């Protein structure tokens, strides 16, 4: 559900490997996929065309799925989940590839906690034009797992399908921590690149912006730890070192959306840190600043 950069990439890889995948799309993207198929462009791996492709704008026409890959924008989570609820069977699994750490709380309230597996996607993609997903680099990693930390028949089955499709998939025994590990870096990357209108390179080189990057992540770690997530106290230091090793041109989807005049997910990124921090009594002034600066672009 959601055939943009993330959903289109993972769904396309699975479909190309022979899995029975139905894409849900709308507008020009839907029309292009119906006429031309789904094209995944990658300068390194080569292009992949999925044609014919099963695509619809009516989820009910897809029947009862074994798995719902949930990849819509965060503000659509509740409405889309309620739309999909009638087609979910008693054994339908739900795996969200969205950003943030509160998505599964929303989904669990609609599908039931037992339906959920937690997931984290590591990939650089966007829709370059209708029917076409552009993938940057070779990274297409997906870490997922059951919330009880145990292996299950459905997680093992999905792992096998993902690996067959060439996706760098792995099972996590502490998916909540895995979600917060990605969230910590994403909060820093998105908050700095979008608010400063630049890529990670200049951010990490300037002492003031480097400190701001670190503090954004430090606040996220403090909130996560207060919520009981098993993050090391110095995890922000680790993520800052990680930031030093990524390409200077690395950017965030939040900044990409800002440049293109799209609605922003800042309410669930920096804003999420602020709201969760308020619940557990952790001050988050840097994330509050990012949220305040970008809030007008987050509401259309």
Where are these regions (language model features)?
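N-terminal glycine-rich dinucleotide-binding loop that anchors FAD/FMN and/or NAD(P) in oxidoreductases
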Residues: 38-55, 186
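Internal alpha-helical scaffold of NAD(P)-dependent oxidoreductase catalytic cores
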Residues: 32, 86-87, 110-119, 128-233
